Amino acid sequence: MSTARWRLVSKASWIARSSQCMCVTTAGQLIVYGGELRPRQPVDSADSSQEGPAVPKPRVGATMVCMDDCLYVWGGRGGVDMAPLDDEQVGVWRAELKTGSDTAEPDGVIWERLSYTDGPEPRSYHAAAATDNDFFIHAGCPTSGRLAQLHKFNIRSRQWEELSSAPAPPRGGTGIVSKNLMSWGRVVLRFGGFSGYELPSVPGTLDLFDPKHDRWYTLQPSPDPIHGYPGARSVCGFAHFESKSPVLSSIVGVLFHGERDASTLGHAGAGTFWDDVWALKKTESNHVVQWAWRKLDVKPADEQGEGESGMPEGRGWFAHAGWQENGTTSVFMHGGLLSSNERSDELWELQIE
């Protein structure tokens, strides 16, 4: 059995939050944006009196991807009524990191609102994944109800394209990853979400989108021989994974934590959360792909670790991002909502061995 090891990287009370977004640049800089410390109150570290070019308003439930060392933010909700932001504010916002004159460390951000026509319906708690010159936006919560739509934005042409909608039910809080498969090419994988109940309703199932044929497929991976399937969940971690290690090379995605049961108070409260880690594995032979779930043995990076420095408490509504170095992916998890209804200030690194 492969092992998932958690390492506490930092604790910073000033950046405690949930419903934020995060990505890692090619230079290894981890960027956190948006979120809330208190329910329905977006956090903002900007000086509200500053003057200059337009910048995005504070928001929760947005997504952010890193492409060509620029950050691309779309979506979210904000304002007093916490409704989805309007067409102008929803984005796409591109952020370029400024560096100091005598250091390579970023000391500011230059924002630009990209112009386009016929963009997706504004929403929050959707999912995003980047690939080559495009990023995908999927599902989420508009002014009312939930969505199943999939859109693609090309950063070169600055054009949106609406693709085939995913299998029902519509959902918020789902997770998607983009992956290149030998027999398929580039695909998008989807797991979980919330549609009045935690998903998937059929244990272990996930959905695959084939961009070449603009078509969705529902997959039923084989279960873990001992633990079966990962439980239904939303607002969880679902991260792309790659490794040159022969033992780990079949792992394409990592699923972890997330909401197990929603709070009766809705967005104002905390439900119950998973604290597990699962590997989604695939093998290919003669152009036939086989999928399997495997539950990982979870341990602290320091075997003697105890308490808060050992392993993270179960949570949901956090930000996560993958980072590849030396041929292996590390997954980072920041903040999130705990069962105590408090927002975490922790940054954790997950490594699989």
What are these regions (language model features)?
Residues 1-353:
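Kelch-like beta-propeller repeat domains
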